[in-house]
């Protein structure tokens, strides 16, 4: 099929990661995946949740939100509604799980890392972009903490990134745009570490059930995309 942006079925959208995007956070990134743009910031508190007190273990938690102008129709802020909508809750928990999977909290001490992800323009794949960008911001933040003598070493076990895959008009596609996502028969988000371990797979048949063989094909394509994203992360961090 011919995609709107002329990509092949197996191509990512253009990815740009701008580090140190904001002045005040420990780490900050603007990640752009096609027309999707997400600001990811990292802050730290010198305390942990009650269940971790006295353990010398750290913690990480995440928040996710979409600015009113991030979508074609104005999106009402959760603070105005007085409640976080279910989708945002699901996504911020996913972001937290994804990043906790690659952190050695015994090396962080009793500190809490806060990840804040704010979508400033949504064109599909906001949760996967948030995970991919937040990891880079987290790496920068932990590197600064090490440089400042707050921690002895960067407690990252390995890199992690995320991407969407799906079936649109019977064809398997990587990194769906909003237009493709709306038309998808199957929509899937995959989070994976650099060593090829899955952190999360979210897959739904929106219109047509999918086969085991199609599942394997989608996971293989997602892995290819994630390995490319990890390469982009490393280049952004100056590690390649």
Curated annotation (Swiss-Prot):
- What is its biological role? Phosphorolytic 3'-5' exoribonuclease that plays an important role in tRNA 3'-end maturation. Removes nucleotide residues following the 3'-CCA terminus of tRNAs; can also add nucleotides to the ends of RNA molecules by using nucleoside diphosphates as substrates, but this may not be physiologically important. Probably plays a role in initiation of 16S rRNA degradation (leading to ribosome degradation) during starvation.
What does the subunit section of this Swiss-Prot or TrEMBL entry state? Homohexameric ring arranged as a trimer of dimers.
User: Binding residues for phosphate, per the UniProt record?
Assistant: 87, 125-127
What protein family is recorded? Belongs to the RNase PH family.
Reported EC number(s) for this entry are 2.7.7.56
Q: Which InterPro entries is this protein grouped with?
A: ExoRNase_PH_dom1, ExoRNase_PH_dom2, ExoRNase_PH_dom2_sf, PNPase/RNase_PH_dom_sf, Ribosomal_Su5_D2-typ_SF, RNase_PH, RNase_PH_bac-type
Q: What is a GO molecular function of this protein? A: tRNA binding
User: What is the official name of this protein in its record?
Assistant: Ribonuclease PH
| Reaction(s) catalysed by this chain's protein | tRNA(n+1) + phosphate = tRNA(n) + a ribonucleoside 5'-diphosphate
| The keyword Ion transport is assigned to this record | no
Biological process (GO) annotations held by this record are:
rRNA catabolic process; rRNA processing; tRNA processing
